[in-house]
Amino acid sequence: MTDKTYKIAVLPGDGIGPEVMAQAHKVLDAIEKKHAIHFEREEHDVGGIAIDNHGCPLPQSTVTACEESDAVLFGSVGGPKWEHLPPNDQPERGALLPLRKHFQLFCNLRPAQIHSGLEAFSPLRADISGRGFDIVVVRELTGGIYFGQPKGREGEGANEKAYDTEIYHRFEIERIAKIAFESARLRRKKVCSIDKANVLQSSILWREVVEELAKDYPDVELSHMYIDNATMQLIKDPAQFDVMLCSNIFGDIISDECAMITGSMGMLPSASLNESKFGLYEPAGGSAPDIAGKNIANPVAQILSAALMLRYSLGEEAAAQDIENAVSQALAAGELTADLAGDKPALSTAEMGDKIAQYILNS
């Protein structure tokens, strides 16, 4: 049987990006050995290193490589070296936002969970974190109040005013809700849709459309929750949630809250998808230039981003689960990088990558 081949554009970027990406490569190598899969991988410049080498944060050659690939595995961009540049020329705004726009990445997926043995890092009370949680926030990324028109400021003195417009079209709600329901089918089959339908017209439409779409997913349990209650319930009982479906602004709030209650940002991957399931996969954290090159960064978020890539863009669920299980095994065995080890001996970035790859091969 011939191996399935996937073409991956690998964009390590700046700061800790290259060293954590090297660990994702090790894990993908292990997946190739275990499964009938081959990854054709090419690395390309993005962010600050692209400014240094090409004069701009997102060279056309990088965009072309992404267009010719099945998915993009992204590291991190930015650092003090480029902060003097105009905002639109800086690595973050000049690379990530144009990539999202170019590929019409309307859906952001942010998993958040407490891994066994890491409960103490959560700011939640021990009896709450001890129950564990495993949530995926499905956030609409291109609509809503951040992009709705009109927006602006006018007037002066006491009559000066500013305004933004929350707009959602039926098709925007349908396509993001579809991803939430399909994600739930791969998990515990529960979707909680977050809105403010007691006040906002956009939320009333949101709820109506989600209810209609739910009829196509009779195996998935749908519930609704107002955003203000949802932020409280995440603190009180996060274990009740499986997939949380959110508009742009509500998802912005909820995904950051979910990240914080895990207590370990270095562990959190994210995915941004378009309608054809093409995606950009990246750690939720930043480029951490203060620890770059020291071989101490936690590579788990980058490795789990590769697992999301396998699941959502490539449809390789078994391989994705192998990576996630290997990460869980390493953490449960107390194999931790410096950000989590505390007083115990810490693994280096490279050692953590080696451990996780070995767990995959041994499974």
UniProtKB/Swiss-Prot annotation:
PROSITE patterns, sorted: IDH_IMDH
Keywords: Amino-acid biosynthesis, Branched-chain amino acid biosynthesis, Cytoplasm, Leucine biosynthesis, Magnesium, Manganese, Metal-binding, NAD, Oxidoreductase
GO CC terms, sorted: cytosol
Assigned EC number: 1.1.1.85
UniProt: Mg(2+) binding residues: 228, 252, 256
UniProt keyword Cytoplasm, yes or no: yes
GO biological process, any: L-leucine biosynthetic process
Binding residue positions for NAD(+): 79-92, 286-298
Site (Important for catalysis): 146, 196
Cell compartments where the protein resides: Cytoplasm
Catalytic reaction(s) noted: (2R,3S)-3-isopropylmalate + NAD(+) = 4-methyl-2-oxopentanoate + CO2 + NADH
Region forming the signal peptide: none
Physiological role: Catalyzes the oxidation of 3-carboxy-2-hydroxy-4-methylpentanoate (3-isopropylmalate) to 3-carboxy-4-methyl-2-oxopentanoate. The product decarboxylates to 4-methyl-2 oxopentanoate.
PANTHER family: 3-ISOPROPYLMALATE DEHYDROGENASE (PTHR42979:SF1)
Stated name of the protein: 3-isopropylmalate dehydrogenase
Lineage: Bacteria, Pseudomonadati, Pseudomonadota, Gammaproteobacteria, Vibrionales
